[in-house]
Amino acid sequence: MFLSFDVIGDLTFGEGFGQLESGVKNRSVNDFVSLGFVGGLRSMFPTISWLSLYLPIPVFRDATKIQYRTFDYAQGALDRHAKRVEELGSDPQPTVFSKLYTAGAEDVWTPIEIRDNAQVFIVGGSDTTANSMIYLIWAVCKIPDVRRKLLKELEGLREDFGYDELREMPYLNCIVNETLRLFTALPCGLPRIVPAGGADLAGHFIPAGATVTTQAYSLHRDEHAFPDPYRFYPDRWENTTQEMKDCTMPFGGGSRTCLGRHLARIELRLITARFFKSFPNATVSELEGMCDKDMEPALHFLMVPSGHRCLINLEG
């Protein structure tokens, strides 16, 4: 989690959030993680967002406070980025926002819209990738045959390998695909409003104004596309069928697909290769009562381990 927060901070604002250095979850990280819990409610029941401003119910009140604090964190990161550019005369490194400013976004977007997008970038690029990475490492450590096959593929990597060397590693990519299928970061529905005139969908007419949604969790467990769907089985991706492609949407789909999907795959490949090159004998720990139940998915807006921990024995 600390790594993904620092990566998205560096790419978006030109600086990390200091999580790797401190090794401590501060309030800002906890707040962004908490958004995953209330995000599902807001996605399915958008009226709740409005009611939370007026109802004295603790969970709604706390969610609103957290939301506004994350806006403040995003604005602070934007302000620090702007100050560095002003002091240096130019951006010391390319960032998401330096590209937006170059494109004249500040002339099109209001300051509030820029801040809101900054907040979305942090939310979308941090806890999501971190949760997928946790499940990937856990699953590979838990299944010896999968780990052996991955280690065999990684044998030829030099110690200071780069991303280009990982792009064409078939089994590594199979593991990433299977992780995104079984442990997709965003399992809940993504609501869409039917436009004027209505729409025909799978032989059914949907009237204008109705809300329709797709749910990755169910699609990714379609037994026709994925036999034995609850099994973590990367080998299934060695012979990808069209039905598998049609039922796979870890990043959404269409024109609204996730902006950071390529970044997520880059991080998953790099971290997986580095972790198992460094700790080839890693296994799932049983310390402190750690067990499979800790890793059962808790489904909010994001998928997270219900035990909120994943203990790994690095030395096997």
Q: Which residue stretches match the model-derived regions?
A:
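Conserved cytochrome P450 K-helix/beta-meander segment immediately N-terminal to the heme-binding cysteine loop
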Residues: 195, 214-241
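Cytochrome P450 heme-binding "Cys pocket" and the immediately downstream C-terminal segment
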Residues: 144-146, 243-244, 261-301, 305
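Hydrophobic, repeat-rich solenoid/adaptor surfaces of innate immune receptors and signaling proteins
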Residues: 12, 133-137, 216, 268, ...
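C-terminal helix/juxtamembrane-tail motif
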Residues: 300-316
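Cytochrome P450 I-helix active-site segment
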Residues: 24-34, 90-96, 139-186, 202, ...
